[in-house]
Every structure is written in C-alpha cells, then in structure tokens.
Amino acid sequence: MRELLFRGQTRRKGQKVRMHGTPVESNWVYGGIFPGTGDYSVIYTYDPIDKYAVYTDTIGQFTGRIDKNGEKVFEGDILHVTVDGQDWGVGVVQWCDHDQCFSLFTFPNSNHRLIDFGDLGLPEYYEIIGNMYDDPHLLSAGGEINA
C-alpha cells in the first residue's frame, strides 16, 4: 500500500516571514490534510505533532512514485522524462479524472497529456526539476524545457 501524504505551501514564492529574526523564504509542509473550503486548508504533521495553514491551491498528493534521485513525486511537480537517452519532454504531474490516474501534462489544467504514470516506467526515466507553483517558467505548451 502506498503512503498517503500531502504537501502544501504556507507562503507564496517570494513572500518572506521572520523566524527567530531570520527572513525565511516560502516553504512546504508535509503530512495529513484537513481540506478547507476557502483559500486555506490545514496540513498536520506527526513528528513533531503540529498543524499549518497552507494555501489550498498548492496542495498536492504524493503519487506513490519516487524519481531517479530518490525524491517523492507529488501532484504539481514538474518532471523531465528521458527514456533510453531519448528526451520525452517536461510535464506537470496532475490527477486525470477521466482515466482515474496521475498523468504528466505539458502545462497545468491542459488536455495535452505526455504520459500516464502507469506507463512511465522506472524511476531512472524521470527527474523532478521543480514545481508549478515556484517554477512555472519551466513549463511550455510544447513540453520542452524552458530556460
């Protein structure tokens, strides 16, 4: 059985707060979820036990997959896919209601799917290069990497 894990962003990219006098960039928290009906939801952690208000639109579920660097892949992550040395392009991980599976799309909320996660193959074929909240510039309509 795969791990049920969610993540959410407590602050927007570029938004800073001070913790113990030190400015801190936007961050992510990981854990369980209490979904909200408005702009905010709550992610709770187990060790230590705590809760965090996060932006609802940044919440993503762990897909059960890890990339070639051993990083957990979440909804909203941007992956670069290379199979047997052939560049397949870049896509954002999103849930596909029609097929009831996670898929890679060329850009958020598009109908242009690169590949279903079930067909993605081995972890060495894909690498997380960012996420659609902090790194939207990495996505393009054609699925190639934007510099």
Walk through the language-model features, giving the residues of each:
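Secondary-structure transition motif
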Residues: M1-A147
